[in-house]
Amino acid sequence: MMSYLKQPPYAVNGLSLTTSGMDLLHPSVGYPATPRKQRRERTTFTRAQLDVLEALFAKTRYPDIFMREEVALKINLPESRVQVWFKNRRAKCRQQQQQQQNGGQNKVRPAKKKTSPAREVSSESGTSGQFTPPSSTSVPTIASSSAPVSIWSPASISPLSDPLSTSSSCMQRSYPMTYTQASGYSQGYAGSTSYFGGMDCGSYLTPMHHQLPGPGATLSPMGTNAVTSHLNQSPASLSTQGYGASSLGFNSTTDCLDYKDQTASWKLNFNADCLDYKDQTSSWKFQVL
């Protein structure tokens, strides 16, 4: 009895059973060694089988079950082998495409690196070429503005013999402005341009010089030899006037401008076709044509 109790207690549902007892109860149940994975034999395709598979792959990369079974019957292989072959063939095709793309990028990238400096140089040369003409043209303007004597020489004003050229506006100012530090703003008159064209009062009007105040700032001198041949100037036109911040200096003729008082403001008596001066003490009133 005691020996029976000393035996392993079988009534505990086998939890406390030893391996010997387990082997006695279930001799067939044993834990085998590392289970060996079943390997498939490598399928070797013949040339004829590969030709049939390649022909179908050229038509479609994803054949359905019916097409795979039909090809499997032709080449005498199971359908699963045909499916695996198409799977491997698609992977191989993708790998080849990636290699071609990577190889093409590796070949193109050095070419881009080589051509990029040339493009930068060409772009820099292009931009410098674009900015070169303004710089070259600005040099003559500075030189001409620094020498007002050459601008106002009779030779440069001689082409202005015909002030009455065809023009649409009465008060159109067609002479450019060039800046000099010595004489404020000086007008560089272009040849064969009209001052006030299309009106009868054009022969009496002379260009008005907008003068800025400053130490030694005077009106730019004009050659009297070329001007007096067409315009009769009064002593007031040859005199230089320096006014305040918003003053005007005029080169006028006795037929058009009447200088009343040197200390007072200017009074302009223009032809009725162009300007009408209503009140001397009030502001200017212009009659628009």
UniProtKB/Swiss-Prot annotation:
Keyword Repeat: no
Polar residues biased stretches: 123-132
SMART domains recorded: HOX
Record-annotated DNA-binding residue ranges: 38-97
Keyword set, alphabetical order: Developmental protein, Disease variant, DNA-binding, Homeobox, Microphthalmia, Nucleus
Annotated effect of mutating P134R: In CPHD6; uncertain significance; loss of transcriptional activity, when tested on bicoid binding sites; decreases transactivation mediated by the wild-type protein, when tested on bicoid binding sites; no effect on DNA-binding
InterPro entries reported for this sequence: HD, Homeobox_CS, Homeodomain-like_sf, Otx2_TF, Otx_TF, Otx_TF_C
Main location (coarse class): nucleus
Matches recorded under SUPFAM superfamilies: Homeodomain-like
Domain of life: Eukaryota
Cited Pfam families: Homeodomain, TF_Otx
Presence of the UniProt keyword DNA-binding in the record: yes
Cellular component annotations (GO), alphabetically ordered: chromatin; growth cone; nucleus; protein-containing complex
Region annotation Disordered: where it falls in the sequence: 93-143
One annotated GO biological process: regulation of smoothened signaling pathway
Disulfide bond entries: none
Composition skew (Low complexity), residue ranges: 95-106, 133-143
One MF annotation (Gene Ontology) recorded for this entry: RNA polymerase II cis-regulatory region sequence-specific DNA binding
Record: disease: Microphthalmia, syndromic, 5: Patients manifest unilateral or bilateral microphthalmia/clinical anophthalmia and variable additional features including pituitary dysfunction, coloboma, microcornea, cataract, retinal dystrophy, hypoplasia or agenesis of the optic nerve, agenesis of the corpus callosum, developmental delay, joint laxity, hypotonia, and seizures. Microphthalmia is a disorder of eye formation, ranging from small size of a single eye to complete bilateral absence of ocular tissues (anophthalmia). Pituitary hormone deficiency, combined, 6: Combined pituitary hormone deficiency is defined as the impaired production of growth hormone and one or more of the other five anterior pituitary hormones. CPHD6 patients manifest neonatal hypoglycemia, and deficiencies of growth hormone, thyroid-stimulating hormone, luteinizing hormone, follicle stimulating hormone and adrenocorticotropic hormone.
Role this protein plays: Transcription factor probably involved in the development of the brain and the sense organs. Can bind to the bicoid/BCD target sequence (BTS): 5'-TCTAATCCC-3'.
Family in the record: Belongs to the paired homeobox family. Bicoid subfamily.
Name of the protein this chain belongs to: Homeobox protein OTX2
Organism, as annotated: Homo sapiens (Human)
Primary gene name: OTX2
